Structure formats: structure tokens, C-alpha cells
């Protein structure tokens, strides 16, 4: 199981999407998920909510990422439409290859696909049939209110050549231990350690649990 820290490896909520959280994640060799928005004439910034002048610039984030030279996976959550061209320039400038973009609107996603981005589609209780499935590199699997992910669903995606990233239940304020046990069993039975990721608020605990 590949571990992605949710908005970085933060110790308190104020550290989410901060340099400190990103630095801590990379030091511990965890990939991460973070949020991208536009900042008017200021380019792309890191921010889950509405952007402000205090937000970290994406270019500075990529500089930090490249400093570690570890090629860790980056899940780039697209929070605003129309970022494709600016994002592509930065990805090419910093030679970012182990990444995927996701969570944008469907019309916006099609533009990313046309520009050959690594795009993940979504699957959840509300999105039972993932959009643009054939063109997606992988699936972002989200359990908002209940546990529905099972071995057969994951096997179908893997057999179709897709990578899979599961949203850990604690991100939706649900207990995660039972689901983690099931994910671990699925991973073991299908032998898909290199194709399965989990996005979590507890990266250290996840690393110990899934990779013991």
C-alpha cells in the first residue's frame, strides 16, 4: 500500500497544506494529496478554501518536492476550472511525473485528458459509474457515509489497467480500523501493493498497519 498524507503530514489542523506538513511528509517518504486553486494574476496556489495572498505558490511546492528527489506520488485536487495550461507548464518545468489530477468538473477533466495529464476519475455512493473511465489513469474511491468498496470492485479496476486510490474513512469522520483490515486483506489476496494507494490523516499508523 502506498501512503498519501491528506493535505500533508500535519500535527495540528493549522498545519494542513503548509510547508511544514509537506516537508514532514516528504522526509518520511510519504506521497501526499493537496489542493490547487488560481490566485488571479498570481498563478496557481495551494488552498482548499478560497485563496488569499498568504497561500503557498504551487511553484514553491514543486521546488520543495524536487529537493527530496524521491519521486513520491502527488494527488493534485483541482479546486478551480481552467488551470490546465499553467499547471502543465509547471509540471514540465519541474519534471513532475508521479502525479495525478482529480476532482475537477467533467468538462474541465476532458481538457486535462486532451492535454495528456494523468487524470483520475471518481467513484463513490453518488458516482457509481465513473465518468470518462476508459480515458482515466486511475480511480479515486470515496466512501462518504458507508463502506461499499470490496475485492471485486478493486479487481475490476486493476484488471482494466487502472491505479486505485482509496479515501480513508477518517477523512469523513468515520472509524477506519475495520475498513483498513478489509483493504489489507484485498491487497494481499490480489497482490496489488504497487497499484493501491490510500489517502489518510494518519500516515504513520497506515504505514505500520499496511506494510508490517
Predicted segments with their positions:
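Phosphate-group recognition and catalysis centered on beta-loop-alpha active-site segments
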Residues: 1-212
Amino acid at each position: 500500500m502506498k501512503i498519501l498524507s491528506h493535505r500533508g503530514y500535519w500535527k495540528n489542523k493549522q498545519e494542513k497544506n503548509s510547508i511544514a506538513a509537506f516537508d514532514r511528509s516528504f522526509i518520511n517518504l510519504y506521497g501526499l494529496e493537496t489542493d490547487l486553486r488560481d490566485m488571479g494574476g498570481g498563478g496557481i496556489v495551494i488552498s482548499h478554501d478560497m485563496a488569499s495572498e498568504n497561500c503557498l505558490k504551487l511553484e514553491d511546492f514543486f521546488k520543495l518536492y524536487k529537493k527530496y528527489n524521491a519521486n513520491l506520488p502527488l494527488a493534485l485536487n483541482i479546486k478551480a476550472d481552467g488551470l490546465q495550461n499553467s499547471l502543465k507548464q509547471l509540471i514540465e518545468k519541474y519534471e513532475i511525473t508521479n502525479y495525478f489530477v482529480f476532482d475537477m468538473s467533467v468538462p474541465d477533466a476532458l481538457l486535462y485528458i486532451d492535454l495528456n495529464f494523468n487524470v483520475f476519475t471518481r467513484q463513490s455512493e453518488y458516482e457509481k459509474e465513473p465518468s470518462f473511465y476508459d480515458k482515466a489513469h486511475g480511480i479515486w474511491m470515496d466512501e462518504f457515509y458507508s463502506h461499499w468498496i470490496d475485492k471485486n470492485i478493486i479487481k475490476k479496476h486493476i484488471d482494466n489497467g487502472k491505479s486505485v486510490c482509496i479515501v480513508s474513512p477518517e477523512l469523513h469522520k468515520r472509524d477506519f480500523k475495520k475498513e483498513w483490515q478489509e483493504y489489507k486483506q484485498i491487497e494481499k489476496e490480489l497482490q496489488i501493493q504497487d497499484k493501491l494507494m490510500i489517502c489518510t490523516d494518519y500516515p504513520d499508523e497506515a504505514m505500520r498497519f499496511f506494510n508490517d
